[in-house]
Amino acid sequence: MKFNDVYNKHHKIIHHLLKKYNISYNYDEYYQLLLIKMWQLSQIYKPSSNQSLSSFLFMRLNFYLIDLFRQQKRLNDIILCENHSPILTEQPTYFNEYDLRLQDVCALLNHRERQWLMLYLEGYKQYEIADIMSLSTSTIKLIKASVKRKCQRFFK
């Protein structure tokens, strides 16, 4: 399917997401980033998958927009940290608690479990993760249960 067709049918998803998150400042910049992401997603979409193109785009664009918000928050935190630094020549260090905990959890996991967790956090569905990792869905369920057990032990 050509991108012009995808755009004509699904461009309202971008407007909906921007309205959903009350984006008025930098609306055009966010719109352009989401439009580029829509083009990328239209290139990787497989019509044979169980998910319709509109739900695929909506879900992935929604997660992408949330990631953009997180990146913007990190940038603002870094700028604030730099402005309040006692010595301006000293490079401020930024620690995100989420990233630090994720690193600690990943240290407990084997390669398959780490790969599953990263794909899961990126928003992939179970059957998509199974395709990407070339495993059966039952194996993915076992990996998920193992990660869940390890995380529960870690956070107790």
UniProtKB/Swiss-Prot annotation:
One of its GO terms (molecular function) is DNA binding. Keywords: DNA-binding, Sigma factor, Transcription, Transcription regulation. GO terms for biological process: DNA-templated transcription initiation. SUPFAM superfamilies: C-terminal effector domain of the bipartite response regulators, Sigma2 domain of RNA polymerase sigma factors. A motif (Polymerase core binding) lies at residues 29-44. Sigma factors are initiation factors that promote the attachment of RNA polymerase to specific initiation sites and are then released. Sigma-S contributes to the protection against external stress, thus playing a role in cellular fitness and survival. This is RNA polymerase sigma factor SigS.
